[in-house]
């Protein structure tokens, strides 16, 4: 299951999972023409699901809508996110300290930090039903406290740092059940959020993410890695 599947990294994750023959629940807030095209190409492999991780009622409805359609989720990838309340992509004006508002901070946290935890809470029983449940929370190096040496990105960076600490806590809580939880940064990717100057294509990033997911073992619980599996600073 992948959240934020209407475009960018999420859509490419759904595409590559379906292409290798696996079933994927492609969850997104509003869907897209590209996602509908993917569903049409693989109607037996791609399940489109309306889900807004920033809205508890939407998450509850999404879980109810999936009832009876899948028995278990082997890998849950919390990919949905926003750069800021005002824009899904990087915006230099949104990085300045004097432009940050309480409303922006709260809304960014609601989607980027609280959202993944809400999704996990309501879909965890399906992950538990898998003999090899894995949860990947898509984070960012911008959320690394020890690597933060510049100003800016206040709402986005703080929300990803919050996601990181919740990932660590959840990893410790679920490890006794054999469920592996990690935080992963996809790299700087050419998407609507990353922009055209980014170093990686969605295809490259997603190949790496799926490779990392396939190789996870219980000893990896609580790690923060990049799309190549390299440890990242907290």
PLM regions: where:
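Conserved glycine-rich cofactor-binding loop
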Residues: 6-7
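N-terminal Rossmann-fold NAD(P) dinucleotide-binding loop
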Residues: 10-11
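Conserved glycine-rich Rossmann-like NAD(P)H-binding loop of the short-chain dehydrogenase/reductase
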Residues: 18-36
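Rossmann-fold cofactor-recognition segment
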Residues: 41-57
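Conserved Rossmann-fold cofactor-binding substructure of NAD(P)-dependent oxidoreductases
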Residues: 54-70
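Catalytic loop of short-chain dehydrogenase/reductase
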Residues: 82-109, 117-118, 124-176
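C-terminal helical subdomain
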Residues: 176, 183-186, 195-234
